[in-house]
Every structure is written in C-alpha cells, then in structure tokens.
C-alpha cells in the first residue's frame, strides 16, 4: 500500500506513509460510502403492495413489493419498506427509517390467560411506535402492546431476526443483535 490509515496511537510506521485518525473504522466506513453510495429506492408504493385506505404514507416514503400496510398506519418521510413487510393496524413509523424484507410489525404478542385446564388469548389492543432513523433487519418481528404502546426509540438499530415482545420500551440509539 502507498499509504496506511491508522489510529492516532499507532507507533510502528517503520518509514511508511501513514494518515493518523482518531477512529479508523469510522473513516473507512465514510470512504466506502463515498466510493459505493447507497441508492435509495424510488418514492412511492409498489403496485403489488396492499395499503389500507386509512393509512397515511408520506409522499417521499418507499413501499416495496408485496408489502401489507394496515388500517391507520402512519409512515414518515423518506422511510423505506423493503419487500414483504407487514404493518398491522395502528403502527407508526417515523422519518428516515429502513424496514428490511420480511419484517412483521404490530402482530399480537404472546398473551394468554389460564382458564382452568386451558388458555384464553389475552386481547392485544395496543400498537407499535417506531422512531426516526431506525433500521430493522430482515425478518424482525415487533409485537403490538397488549395495552398501550410497544416503542422503538429514535436511531435504534435491530439485527436480522430480532423479536421484540409486546409492551417493550426500547430507548434511543440502542443496538440489538440476534
């Protein structure tokens, strides 16, 4: 290499040309972003998506193929739903969020009440609120609250296959990996 990108504390340059930076990983990520920019999908609703008439979708959002958007769903500006995402009724997603393929948001949580020798389903009547700049990995599931709200805070990132149970409150800028 003609030049090495190294942490500030790197002390073994041995005559090589180096560029010292505070956070080499962050700088490399920025360089890769310039060399390989992300191409956002076009705004709009794919013709195979099924969208309830009461859903409110910002004109700059992108709804991918085979998505299902339920009653009273709200989707913010520049949010992207990739293929086969399901948003149950009442789900709210903020701006600039990315929901990868196969996510299910707002399905019933695992709520049951013992009734003698059997179980009865505990009604799940809450909803899900997802903040701004959230990214949900493929096939992530977030259950609606039994009562109230299941919440994912601004800037939070969830890995593929993560499951968030009903009534969970995930704060801002949290990373969760499966």
Where do the model's predicted regions map?
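Short, basic phosphate-binding NTP loop
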Residues: 6-53
């Amino acid at each position: 290499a003609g030049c090495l990108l190294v942490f500030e504390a790197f002390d073994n340059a041995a005559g090589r040309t180096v560029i010292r930076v505070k956070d080499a990983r962050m700088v490399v990520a920025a360089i890769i972003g310039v060399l390989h920019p992300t191409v956002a999908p076009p705004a709009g609703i794919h013709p195979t998506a099924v969208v309830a008439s009461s859903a409110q979708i910002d004109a700059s959002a992108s709804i991918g193929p085979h998505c299902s958007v339920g009653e009273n769903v709200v989707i913010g500006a520049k949010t992207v739903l990739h293929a086969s995402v399901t948003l149950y009724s009442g789900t709210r997603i903020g701006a600039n969020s990315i929901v990868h393929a196969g996510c299910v948001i707002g399905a019933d949580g695992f709520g049951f009440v013992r009734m003698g020798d059997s179980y009865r389903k505990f009604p799940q009547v809450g909803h899900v609120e997802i903040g701004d700049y959230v990214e949900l990995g493929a096939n992530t599931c977030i259950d609606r609250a039994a009562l109230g709200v299941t919440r994912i805070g601004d800037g939070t990132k969830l890995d593929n296959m993560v499951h968030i149970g009903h009534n969970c409150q995930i704060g801002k800028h949290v990373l969760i990996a499966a």
